[in-house]
Design a protein with these regions (language model features):
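Short amphipathic alpha-helix adjacent to the substrate-entry channel of hydrolases
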Residues: 264-282
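Short beta-strand/loop motif that positions the catalytic acidic residue
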Residues: 473, 479-481, 485
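Gly/Ala-rich beta-loop-alpha elbow adjacent to hydrolase catalytic centers
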Residues: 327-335
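Short alpha-helix in the alpha/beta-hydrolase fold that links the catalytic acid
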Residues: 489-499, 510
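Short beta-strand element of the alpha/beta-hydrolase
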Residues: 245-256
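Alpha/beta-hydrolase active-site loop
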Residues: 294-318, 334
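Alpha/beta-hydrolase-fold enzymes
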Residues: 141-176, 316, 320, 338-443, ...
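Amphipathic, low-complexity, repeat-rich surface-exposed segments
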Residues: 1-234, 245-246, 283, 496, ...
């Protein structure tokens, strides 16, 4: 039997109290300085939670109507709580080893397991969190939208009250505070005030050292030229890397919710550079970061001034009428819409279509659905009408909430409680470089696609006077989804296999919405393939073959079938379009956070 460890770290409450008093005195000066620098224009914004009251009222009503289920949940909580108390007593008085902490990054510090007090706190939280979540999840007779909303926001609450997020109950924070004399908390407060100041009163959590990256130098650095531009986009043509190139150019249509260079972070994981190295003449749309002057730009404008304008420009630049096209996320939704538009006009300029993590059937959108209802959209539209656009931070916050522990609370702990210096990380630098969206376009997108799912219905959406029917698309299609995607759930993207009228190949990558896409050869993520397309995604996965390597070479093999031979390498500016400026261009450098 193990015996109590007399060397276990003892906390000195007097020393800690003295240090915290000193921190409080210094922090008062910092806070006073911050507040005096704020414009006298109202309180610090806290976001819009007005739509939650009705959902939780429905939840409580349904809970109270089933007292037996409520009583059973309480009994289960008491029983599990007694187990936690028993474990704590056995550890304290009998020297019992603490159970290993679950694989949860919040509790990786050894004291969460080795220290009796923090082990008890951790186990108590896990039991309480499980009880709350299961009680909410098991409530009967809630309509699906309400059930999803209360489940999502209950998880937000449970994540927020984790003991790892508080000074007094996080052993790593307490240890660091003792070791530094509270300097970590002062640095953390400085970080907090800096983020509040950068967000103009709204908390804009810093995720990485932004000063470590310069666009065009050590990120988004694949050589190329801007060869065309209009109000909505710049078109980049990349320099060739091979003596000859594939005749048919490759057009990449990224989303405009964020910026294209997620596909060009570093040479080792740049899909753009890798495609150039395979002999593609790569063109990429770099969308503008819009302001109030583009408030009236609609979804059809993005089609007309985006891919359709790019097709004309590419023909002038290369002499080639047709392209292979890739659409990423919202860019894929636009690509599908464009293909249906072209099909209606007997236009075959897109020879093959590749979709990265793209929704076209919005029947089931996962947790994103909690933000989509009449009340919330109307509130958002009102704010957008006042500004002319959706604030970049609004969308970024919504995405971050989908993975709150990774993208919110881990940074709260590291930045504000531990006072750590931020580490340069290319993907987080890109993630923090969010863009605004025109009011008219975003309202159309939310109403017609997310809320009403009209794109999946033949003729449900009309663009530039043309009814859009995805079933008329005969273009060969490659669908790439990712297994852990929290924005475009792969089982939802699979629905596209039943929509398109041409041949379809579906591939599933490991990891999530970004990492699974930029999974370069040599990365740790594999993929799954299945040439059959059964009616359900579960049936597809049951018959899929796992591959330990990147999906990129398989895609390149697929798209090679649509080549037209090879031609001498094309340099930007060789054709009818002169080079305007070096890649990555001037549109991409316009940030929303100044």
């Amino acid at each position: 039997m193990a015996t109590p460890d007399p060397t276990q770290q003892a906390w000195d409450p007097v020393a800690l109290a003295n240090q915290l008093q000193g921190v409080a005195e210094k922090s008062q000066k910092l806070l006073t300085g911050f507040l005096s620098a704020q414009p006298n224009s109202g309180q610090i914004g806290m976001g819009d939670a007005s739509t939650l009251g009705g959902a939780f009222f429905d939840l409580m009503t349904k809970m109270m109507s089933d007292p037996t289920a409520l009583a059973n949940a309480q009994i289960n909580l008491i029983n599990e709580g007694m187990t936690v108390w028993r474990h704590a007593a056995e550890r304290m008085f009998l020297g019992r080893e603490s159970e290993a902490a679950p694989k949860d990054k919040r509790f990786k510090h050894p004291d969460w397991t080795e220290n009796a007090v923090f082990s008890f706190i951790r186990e108590s939280y896990v039991v309480a969190a499980k009880s709350v979540l299961s009680s909410v999840h098991d409530v009967k007779d809630l309509d699906p939208a309400t059930a999803r909303k209360v489940d999502f926001y209950t998880r937000q609450y449970v994540d927020a009250i984790s003991p790892s997020n508080f000074i007094a109950t996080n052993p790593e924070v307490l240890t660091t505070t003792l070791q530094t004399g509270g300097q970590n908390l002062l640095r953390g407060l400085e970080n907090l005030l800096s983020d509040l100041d950068r967000g103009e009163g709204r908390l804009a959590i810093s995720m990485t050292d932004k000063s470590a990256f310069r666009l065009g130098e050590n990120i988004a650095s694949t050589p190329g030229k801007v060869v065309f531009q209009n109000d909505l986009m710049q078109l980049i043509q990349y320099d060739p890397a091979t003596p000859d190139v594939r005749r048919r150019p490759l057009l990449i249509i990224p989303p405009w919710i964020n910026k294209f260079y997620v596909l060009d972070l570093q040479p080792k994981n740049s899909f753009i550079k890798w495609s150039v190295d395979q002999g593609h003449t790569v063109f990429v749309i770099s969308w503008v970061n819009p302001d109030e002057r583009l408030a009236k730009k609609n979804f059809e404008d993005y089609m007309l001034e985006g891919p359709l304008a790019a097709l004309e420009a590419i023909e002038k630049a290369t002499g080639e009428r047709s392209v292979n096209a890739v659409g990423y996320c919202l860019g894929g939704t636009l690509l599908a819409s464009t293909l249906a538009y072209l099909a209606a006009h007997d236009d075959d300029r897109i020879a093959s279509a590749t979709y990265f993590v793209t929704l076209v059937d919005f029947t089931e959108v996962g947790d994103m659905g909690v933000f989509i209802d009449d009340e919330q959209i109307s509130s958002l539209e009102k704010r957008m009408q006042e500004r002319g656009y959706l604030e970049a931070q609004d969308m970024a916050t919504s995405f971050n909430m989908l993975r709150a522990n990774d993208l919110i609370w881990s940074f709260v702990v590291n930045n504000y409680l531990l006072g750590k210096e931020q580490i340069p990380f290319d993907l987080l630098f890109w993630n923090s470089d969010a863009t605004r969206m025109p009011a008219a376009m975003h309202s159309f997108y939310l109403r017609n696609m997310y809320q009403r799912n009209l794109l999946a219905k033949p003729g449900g959406v009309t663009l530039a006077g043309t009814p859009i029917d995805l079933t008329k698309i005969k273009t060969p299609t490659f669908l790439l989804s990712t297994r852990e995607d929290h924005i475009a759930p792969w089982k939802s993207t699979y629905a596209a296999t039943r929509l398109y009228g041409g041949p379809v190949k579906f591939v599933l990558s490991a990891s999530g919405h970004m990492a699974g896409v930029i999974s370069a050869p040599g990365s740790k993520y594999g993929h799954w393939t299945n040439d059959d397309l059964p009616p359900t995604p579960d049936a597809w996965f049951a018959g899929a073959q796992a591959h330990p390597s990147s999906w990129w070479p398989q895609w390149d093999e697929w798209v090679t079938a649509f080549d037209l031979g090879r031609v001498a390498a094309r340099a930007p500016g060789d054709g009818e379009l002169p080079a305007i400026e070096n890649a990555p261009g001037s549109y991409v450098v316009v940030r929303s956070d100044g």
